[in-house]
Design a protein with these regions (language model features):
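Short, Lys/Arg-enriched N-terminal segments with co-localized hydrophobic residues
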Residues: 1-7
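Non-catalytic alpha-helical scaffolds and adjoining flexible linkers that form interface surfaces
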Residues: 8-28, 33-38, 42-179
Length: 179
């Protein structure tokens, strides 16, 4: 029937993997912050046993192109293609700590299906910046985290950007603009 086809329509989006959870021998549930649907949970069947699929496509912090279908309130991934991975972050424990903190914060603060394309683009840019940035001391790491949290507070309407700008020196303001 046409109603059944409508339910199983393939939808495509881009998303950054927030976390993954293995649910049985072969399947994984992943939480994704997507560009077009906000935060969603989706199941990907058979990925852990597949010899054809790239298993790293579901690793947290990776940006992927996702083809999926929605049935009721559940998403099932049909196909994923790795679009971007942040290699320099994965090689540096300090960057990994910051990156996973960012992912966890996004996961805890953003509600399911809360679409924010502008914030999604900003998140990808933040990870690009973290990937390029050399962290030379702990203070830099904490400054980045503080700026990120302030950015989230602005996005969530807790602070106005003009209020936050008064707290920064010129040097810190440059970092803040990137994050």
């Amino acid at each position: 029937t046409s109603k059944a086809k409508e339910i199983m329509k393939i939808i495509k989006t881009e998303g950054i993997i927030l976390k993954k959870k293995e649910i049985n021998e072969a399947d994984v549930i992943i939480t994704i912050f997507t560009k077009n649907f906000g935060k969603i949970d989706s199941i990907i069947h058979g990925i852990r046993k597949s010899k054809r699929r790239e298993k790293n496509v579901i690793n947290p912090m990776n940006v992927s192109e996702i083809s999926m279908y929605q049935k009721n309130s559940y998403y099932t991934i049909k196909d994923m293609e790795l679009k971007k991975t942040f290699l320099e972050i994965s090689k540096d424990i300090e960057k990994l700590e910051v990156g996973f903190y960012f992912l966890d914060t996004i996961n805890k603060i953003y509600e399911y299906n809360d679409v924010d394309e502008e914030f999604y683009d900003r998140i990808v840019n933040i990870f690009d910046y973290l990937d390029r940035k050399e962290i030379t001391n702990s203070a830099e790491k904490y400054i980045m985290v503080t700026h990120f949290l302030r950015r989230i507070m602005i996005e969530q309407g807790i602070y106005e950007e003009s209020d936050i700008m008064t707290y920064f020196s010129k040097d810190l303001l440059e970092i803040y603009k990137l994050i």
